[in-house]
UniProtKB/Swiss-Prot annotation:
Family stated for the protein in its record: Belongs to the asfivirus MGF 110 family.
Pfam families assigned: v110
Keywords: Glycoprotein, Host membrane, Membrane, Transmembrane, Transmembrane helix
Protein name (database record): Protein MGF 110-9L
Originating organism: African swine fever virus (isolate Warthog/Namibia/Wart80/1980) (ASFV)
Main location per the UniProt record: host cell
Protein backbone atom coordinates (compact mmCIF):
# COMPACT_ATOMS: atom_id res chain seq x y z
CA UNK A 1 0.00 0.00 0.00
CA UNK A 2 2.82 2.39 0.89
CA UNK A 3 4.48 1.68 -2.45
CA UNK A 4 1.27 2.53 -4.32
CA UNK A 5 0.88 5.81 -2.38
CA UNK A 6 4.52 6.70 -3.08
CA UNK A 7 4.06 6.04 -6.80
CA UNK A 8 0.92 8.22 -6.85
CA UNK A 9 2.79 11.06 -5.10
CA UNK A 10 5.66 10.80 -7.60
CA UNK A 11 3.21 10.82 -10.51
CA UNK A 12 1.59 14.02 -9.17
CA UNK A 13 4.92 15.69 -8.41
CA UNK A 14 6.63 14.75 -11.69
CA UNK A 15 5.28 17.72 -13.72
CA UNK A 16 6.28 20.08 -10.89
CA UNK A 17 9.77 18.56 -10.67
CA UNK A 18 10.25 18.71 -14.43
CA UNK A 19 9.12 22.33 -14.54
CA UNK A 20 11.86 23.40 -12.12
CA UNK A 21 14.86 24.89 -13.94
CA UNK A 22 18.07 22.96 -13.36
CA UNK A 23 21.27 25.00 -12.95
CA UNK A 24 22.75 25.63 -16.39
CA UNK A 25 19.97 23.79 -18.21
CA UNK A 26 17.06 26.21 -17.90
CA UNK A 27 15.50 27.35 -21.15
CA UNK A 28 17.52 29.84 -23.17
CA UNK A 29 15.62 31.55 -26.01
CA UNK A 30 17.44 31.99 -29.31
CA UNK A 31 20.00 34.73 -28.79
CA UNK A 32 23.15 36.18 -30.32
CA UNK A 33 24.63 36.82 -26.88
CA UNK A 34 24.53 33.90 -24.40
CA UNK A 35 24.90 34.70 -20.66
CA UNK A 36 28.46 35.52 -19.62
CA UNK A 37 28.56 32.59 -17.18
CA UNK A 38 27.92 30.19 -20.10
CA UNK A 39 30.56 31.56 -22.45
CA UNK A 40 33.09 28.86 -21.57
CA UNK A 41 30.59 26.17 -22.55
CA UNK A 42 29.51 27.73 -25.84
CA UNK A 43 33.02 28.81 -26.84
CA UNK A 44 34.29 25.27 -26.33
CA UNK A 45 31.83 23.73 -28.78
CA UNK A 46 31.14 26.74 -31.01
CA UNK A 47 34.58 28.26 -30.88
CA UNK A 48 34.27 30.37 -34.03
CA UNK A 49 31.19 32.31 -32.87
CA UNK A 50 31.59 36.07 -32.70
CA UNK A 51 30.46 36.28 -29.07
CA UNK A 52 33.66 34.41 -28.10
CA UNK A 53 35.92 37.16 -29.43
CA UNK A 54 36.88 40.76 -28.69
CA UNK A 55 38.03 42.42 -31.90
CA UNK A 56 39.86 45.73 -32.16
CA UNK A 57 41.79 47.21 -35.08
CA UNK A 58 41.39 43.97 -37.03
CA UNK A 59 42.89 41.79 -34.27
CA UNK A 60 40.73 39.49 -32.14
CA UNK A 61 41.32 38.06 -28.67
CA UNK A 62 39.40 35.13 -27.22
CA UNK A 63 37.17 36.14 -24.29
CA UNK A 64 37.34 32.78 -22.52
CA UNK A 65 40.65 31.10 -23.25
CA UNK A 66 43.48 33.49 -22.46
CA UNK A 67 46.13 31.17 -23.90
CA UNK A 68 44.43 31.16 -27.28
CA UNK A 69 46.64 33.07 -29.75
CA UNK A 70 45.42 36.35 -31.21
CA UNK A 71 43.88 36.03 -34.65
CA UNK A 72 43.06 38.44 -37.43
CA UNK A 73 39.45 39.42 -37.92
CA UNK A 74 38.32 37.43 -40.92
CA UNK A 75 35.66 34.98 -42.00
CA UNK A 76 36.85 32.46 -39.40
CA UNK A 77 34.66 34.38 -36.94
CA UNK A 78 30.99 33.88 -37.72
CA UNK A 79 27.79 35.47 -36.45
CA UNK A 80 26.02 32.79 -34.38
CA UNK A 81 22.77 32.25 -32.55
CA UNK A 82 22.42 29.81 -29.67
CA UNK A 83 19.49 28.38 -27.75
CA UNK A 84 18.71 25.75 -25.15
CA UNK A 85 15.52 23.86 -24.41
CA UNK A 86 15.52 21.26 -21.64
CA UNK A 87 18.66 19.21 -22.31
CA UNK A 88 19.05 20.12 -25.98
CA UNK A 89 21.54 22.85 -26.90
CA UNK A 90 21.71 24.22 -30.42
CA UNK A 91 23.65 26.82 -32.36
CA UNK A 92 23.73 27.91 -35.98
CA UNK A 93 25.60 30.39 -38.13
CA UNK A 94 24.08 33.40 -39.88
CA UNK A 95 26.26 33.02 -42.95
CA UNK A 96 25.64 32.49 -46.64
CA UNK A 97 25.11 28.80 -45.92
CA UNK A 98 23.48 28.24 -42.55
CA UNK A 99 24.82 25.39 -40.48
CA UNK A 100 22.67 24.10 -37.63
CA UNK A 101 23.86 21.78 -34.87
CA UNK A 102 21.94 20.24 -31.96
CA UNK A 103 23.63 18.42 -29.09
CA UNK A 104 23.00 17.23 -25.56
CA UNK A 105 23.83 19.99 -23.06
CA UNK A 106 25.06 17.55 -20.41
CA UNK A 107 26.97 15.30 -22.80
CA UNK A 108 27.91 17.54 -25.72
CA UNK A 109 29.72 16.40 -28.83
CA UNK A 110 32.48 18.53 -30.25
CA UNK A 111 31.59 19.64 -33.76
CA UNK A 112 33.91 21.72 -35.90
CA UNK A 113 31.06 23.34 -37.79
CA UNK A 114 33.25 26.01 -39.32
CA UNK A 115 35.36 23.45 -41.20
CA UNK A 116 32.13 21.77 -42.30
CA UNK A 117 30.79 25.15 -43.41
CA UNK A 118 33.87 25.80 -45.51
CA UNK A 119 33.61 22.33 -47.04
CA UNK A 120 30.02 22.96 -48.14
CA UNK A 121 31.08 26.19 -49.83
CA UNK A 122 33.89 24.39 -51.64
CA UNK A 123 31.71 21.43 -52.62
CA UNK A 124 29.13 23.42 -54.56
CA UNK A 125 30.46 22.19 -57.90
CA UNK A 126 27.93 21.34 -60.61
CA UNK A 127 28.29 17.97 -62.30
CA UNK A 128 27.32 18.84 -65.89
CA UNK A 129 27.05 15.24 -67.11
CA UNK A 130 24.68 14.25 -64.31
CA UNK A 131 22.50 17.31 -64.94
CA UNK A 132 22.33 16.53 -68.68
CA UNK A 133 21.37 12.94 -67.95
CA UNK A 134 18.71 14.04 -65.46
CA UNK A 135 17.20 16.55 -67.90
CA UNK A 136 17.07 13.96 -70.70
CA UNK A 137 15.28 11.48 -68.40
CA UNK A 138 12.75 14.12 -67.38
CA UNK A 139 12.08 15.15 -71.00
CA UNK A 140 11.66 11.50 -72.03
CA UNK A 141 9.24 10.89 -69.15
CA UNK A 142 7.09 13.93 -69.99
CA UNK A 143 7.04 13.03 -73.72
CA UNK A 144 6.05 9.44 -72.94
CA UNK A 145 3.21 10.54 -70.65
CA UNK A 146 1.89 12.92 -73.34
CA UNK A 147 2.06 10.27 -76.07
CA UNK A 148 0.31 7.56 -74.02
CA UNK A 149 -2.39 9.98 -72.90
CA UNK A 150 -3.08 11.01 -76.52
CA UNK A 151 -3.22 7.41 -77.79
CA UNK A 152 -5.20 6.18 -74.82
CA UNK A 153 -8.08 8.61 -75.51
CA UNK A 154 -8.48 7.20 -79.04
CA UNK A 155 -8.61 3.54 -78.04
CA UNK A 156 -11.72 1.57 -77.08
CA UNK A 157 -10.37 -0.93 -74.59
CA UNK A 158 -11.72 -3.22 -71.90
CA UNK A 159 -11.19 -2.47 -68.22
CA UNK A 160 -8.61 -5.25 -67.79
CA UNK A 161 -6.55 -3.98 -70.74
CA UNK A 162 -6.69 -0.44 -69.39
CA UNK A 163 -5.52 -1.69 -66.00
CA UNK A 164 -2.55 -3.48 -67.58
CA UNK A 165 -1.61 -0.33 -69.51
CA UNK A 166 -1.76 1.74 -66.33
CA UNK A 167 0.34 -0.79 -64.40
CA UNK A 168 2.93 -0.90 -67.17
CA UNK A 169 2.99 2.89 -67.28
CA UNK A 170 3.53 3.16 -63.52
CA UNK A 171 6.35 0.59 -63.62
CA UNK A 172 8.04 2.48 -66.47
CA UNK A 173 7.67 5.81 -64.72
CA UNK A 174 9.05 4.28 -61.52
CA UNK A 175 12.13 3.03 -63.39
CA UNK A 176 12.67 6.42 -65.04
CA UNK A 177 12.24 8.36 -61.80
CA UNK A 178 14.60 5.99 -59.98
CA UNK A 179 17.14 6.58 -62.72
CA UNK A 180 16.74 10.33 -62.31
CA UNK A 181 17.18 10.19 -58.53
CA UNK A 182 20.17 7.85 -58.71
CA UNK A 183 21.92 10.16 -61.18
CA UNK A 184 21.45 13.37 -59.24
CA UNK A 185 24.71 14.85 -57.92
CA UNK A 186 25.44 13.26 -54.56
CA UNK A 187 26.28 15.40 -51.54
CA UNK A 188 29.97 15.14 -50.70
CA UNK A 189 29.05 15.47 -47.01
CA UNK A 190 28.23 11.76 -47.10
CA UNK A 191 30.35 10.20 -49.85
CA UNK A 192 30.12 6.48 -50.37
CA UNK A 193 33.08 4.16 -50.82
CA UNK A 194 36.14 5.73 -52.45
CA UNK A 195 39.81 4.96 -52.99
CA UNK A 196 40.92 8.56 -52.66
CA UNK A 197 39.23 10.79 -50.06
CA UNK A 198 38.89 14.51 -50.85
CA UNK A 199 42.01 16.59 -50.27
CA UNK A 200 40.38 18.51 -47.42
CA UNK A 201 39.64 15.21 -45.57
CA UNK A 202 43.20 13.88 -45.72
CA UNK A 203 44.15 15.18 -42.28
CA UNK A 204 41.25 13.29 -40.70
CA UNK A 205 41.85 10.02 -42.52
CA UNK A 206 45.64 10.16 -42.21
CA UNK A 207 45.33 10.64 -38.45
CA UNK A 208 43.26 7.50 -37.95
CA UNK A 209 44.29 5.48 -41.02
CA UNK A 210 47.90 6.58 -41.10
CA UNK A 211 49.18 3.58 -43.09
CA UNK A 212 46.90 4.15 -46.08
CA UNK A 213 48.61 4.79 -49.40
CA UNK A 214 46.69 8.00 -50.08
CA UNK A 215 48.56 9.61 -47.15
CA UNK A 216 51.93 9.17 -48.83
CA UNK A 217 53.82 10.44 -51.86
CA UNK A 218 56.37 7.86 -52.94
CA UNK A 219 59.28 8.38 -55.32
CA UNK A 220 62.32 6.17 -55.93
CA UNK A 221 61.35 3.90 -53.02
CA UNK A 222 61.12 6.75 -50.49
CA UNK A 223 57.77 8.01 -49.17
CA UNK A 224 56.85 11.36 -47.66
CA UNK A 225 53.69 12.03 -45.68
CA UNK A 226 51.27 14.35 -47.50
CA UNK A 227 49.67 15.78 -44.36
CA UNK A 228 52.21 15.84 -41.53
CA UNK A 229 55.36 17.58 -42.75
CA UNK A 230 57.23 16.68 -39.53
CA UNK A 231 56.74 12.96 -40.14
CA UNK A 232 60.08 11.33 -41.08
CA UNK A 233 60.55 9.99 -44.61
CA UNK A 234 60.10 6.21 -44.73
CA UNK A 235 61.05 3.43 -47.11
CA UNK A 236 58.29 2.17 -49.39
CA UNK A 237 57.30 -1.23 -48.02
CA UNK A 238 54.30 -3.13 -46.71
CA UNK A 239 53.85 -0.52 -43.95
CA UNK A 240 51.92 1.38 -46.63
CA UNK A 241 48.83 -0.51 -47.79
CA UNK A 242 46.00 0.10 -50.24
CA UNK A 243 42.91 1.43 -48.48
CA UNK A 244 39.31 2.24 -49.24
CA UNK A 245 37.39 4.76 -47.13
CA UNK A 246 33.70 5.52 -46.83
CA UNK A 247 31.43 7.73 -44.80
CA UNK A 248 27.69 7.54 -44.25
CA UNK A 249 26.19 10.25 -42.04
CA UNK A 250 28.32 10.04 -38.89
CA UNK A 251 29.82 6.60 -39.48
CA UNK A 252 33.32 6.52 -40.95
CA UNK A 253 34.95 3.33 -42.15
CA UNK A 254 38.26 2.42 -43.73
CA UNK A 255 39.44 -0.95 -44.90
CA UNK A 256 42.90 -2.22 -45.75
CA UNK A 257 43.32 -4.36 -48.85
CA UNK A 258 46.20 -6.52 -47.68
CA UNK A 259 46.77 -10.28 -47.75
CA UNK A 260 43.61 -10.41 -45.67
CA UNK A 261 40.74 -7.94 -45.68
CA UNK A 262 40.63 -5.68 -42.61
CA UNK A 263 38.20 -2.88 -41.82
CA UNK A 264 37.50 -0.47 -38.98
CA UNK A 265 34.30 1.46 -38.20
CA UNK A 266 34.19 4.55 -36.04
CA UNK A 267 32.14 7.62 -35.19
CA UNK A 268 33.25 10.48 -37.50
CA UNK A 269 32.66 13.18 -34.89
CA UNK A 270 34.31 11.22 -32.08
CA UNK A 271 36.76 8.89 -33.81
CA UNK A 272 38.75 6.32 -31.93
CA UNK A 273 42.37 5.88 -32.88
CA UNK A 274 43.03 2.25 -33.72
CA UNK A 275 46.40 0.83 -34.72
CA UNK A 276 44.67 -1.30 -37.29
CA UNK A 277 47.94 -2.14 -39.04
CA UNK A 278 49.26 -3.77 -35.86
CA UNK A 279 45.96 -5.62 -35.51
CA UNK A 280 46.23 -6.68 -39.14
CA UNK A 281 49.75 -8.01 -38.56
CA UNK A 282 48.48 -9.90 -35.52
CA UNK A 283 45.85 -11.59 -37.68
CA UNK A 284 48.52 -12.52 -40.22
CA UNK A 285 50.79 -13.97 -37.53
CA UNK A 286 47.92 -16.02 -36.12
CA UNK A 287 47.13 -17.31 -39.59
CA UNK A 288 50.77 -18.27 -40.19
CA UNK A 289 50.82 -20.20 -36.90
CA UNK A 290 47.90 -22.35 -37.95
Amino acid sequence: MKVIVLLLVLAVMQPVIQSQPFPGTEELPMTRRPPKKELEYWCTYAKSCDFCWNCRHGVCKNKVFEKHPLIKKNDYIQICRVSRYNDRCSYFTDSRIRRFHIMSCTNPTYYDWFDELMQVKEDRVIDVENIKHTCLCMIATIALIGYIRKQYSRMQLQAATRLLIFLGLYVLLGILMTNIIMNLPLSTDNPMQMRRPPERDLKFWCTYAKHCDFCWTCKDGMCKNKVFSDHPIITQNDYIVNCTVSRWHDRCMYEAHFRIHYQHNMNCSQPKDLEWFIELKRHLINQDDL
